[in-house]
Amino acid sequence: MKKLLIAATVVLVSSSPLVLLPMEKELTLTPKQVQKLTQNTTASLTQFKQVPKNPRTITTILTYKNKDLTEFKTSIQADTKLSISAIFWNAKGEPVFQLQDGDYVAASQKSIVDDSIYNQKPVDMTFWTKDGLTVYKEPYVLGTEKADSKLASFKPIKVSKAAQTHAGTYYLVDGEGWINASDLSRIDNRIEAVQKVLNEKYNNQERISVYVKQLDTDRVAAINDEKSMYAASVAKLGVLYYAQERLSQKKLSLSDEYQYTSAVNGFPGAYDPDGSGKISKMPDDKNYSLENLLKAVAQNSDNVATNILGYYVTNQYDKAFQKSVDKAAATSWNMDKKELTARAAGTLMEAIYRQNGDIITYLSSTDYDGERISKNIDVPVAHKIGDAYDFKHDVAIVYADSPFILSIFTDKEGYDKITSIADDVYGILK
């Protein structure tokens, strides 16, 4: 047996008989009586008690000729404004609306809503507009007109008021109109615009891989970013990252020196010394400082400098090197085959950005700043290029107001294609 003090809005349901205690007397209800009482209470909570200011149907409703709703007349479709003249309670104790034409409908909040504006209050908030947003003259209720607004998608806006309607929460942009919260983002959403452009212009071009990551939001846009290509000199980012890590750990010093012997060009994974760079192609047995070697790799893409660092600093790309770089790149960084993806290169460039060491400075002033990604960009760019055979790549940190990673791998495409992609991305994220 359970006891319950009679109250207007509280009912406890039990499978056993329920005892109500009005004053000092006990009243026992059967389970069926409890169920009926519960149903009546639930129905009461979903029924109107007065005529709403701006009634609108949200489902198809039936109309009747009498208050008891037994003589069917017709139906009214959803999203129809109602003209209600009065509210009555019929013989069953159910509230019903009388329409202006004399018909009756159930006064249920399950099928009719008060389509009015309420809870309007001042706010001071910033949002980003979503693609295809709609601006209204007032918070939306049925019949509200759209505003003549020139607000663009993927732009920051300030709002000054918030209001509720049955359609949701709306925010006021002064001088423009009201926007539903579903058309707004609390975080910078421009990466969605980047993805849209990539899809429209480059997605069907299998010889292009692009990875973009906004560093303030950690949001990514990409096409073919998991496609593996010969990375050429982009793979040198692994050497730069590892050297910076050991510098930060005080295990190395920029003044450390290493001798250029014939051995440095002969270990597995070594670059062809006849390739890019200014250091002698033939071993000269001279000592080179770590600082100068890092600058040569970052700024001149020097193959010999990479080999010297690979031989001494990474111990010929040993397990410690591999473990560290694989973790930073979130994938296996293959210095032998040098097969990598735009995503892996972009991820490692982000790791170098997070290190915030000397490597960033070196990568910001290279022999290749007048081409590819940085060609038309008017903010600082730290980047690493890669060229071999038909492969042309560039991986960059672009220091816009909201910095981002841009990694572009291409096969059988020119530098201008990389520049075009970079211009498209920067045009949105600058």
Each PLM stretch: what is its role?
Residues 189-193, 262, 268-355:
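Active-site-adjacent helix/loop patches that line small-molecule binding or acyl-intermediate pockets
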Residues 230-260, 297, 406:
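Active-site SXXK
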Residues 183-228, 298:
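Beta-lactamase-like hydrolase cores
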Residues 27-40, 69-109, 152-182:
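SH3/SH3-like beta-barrel superfamily modules
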Residues 2-5, 10-63, 75-76, 92-95, ...:
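SH3-family beta-barrel domains
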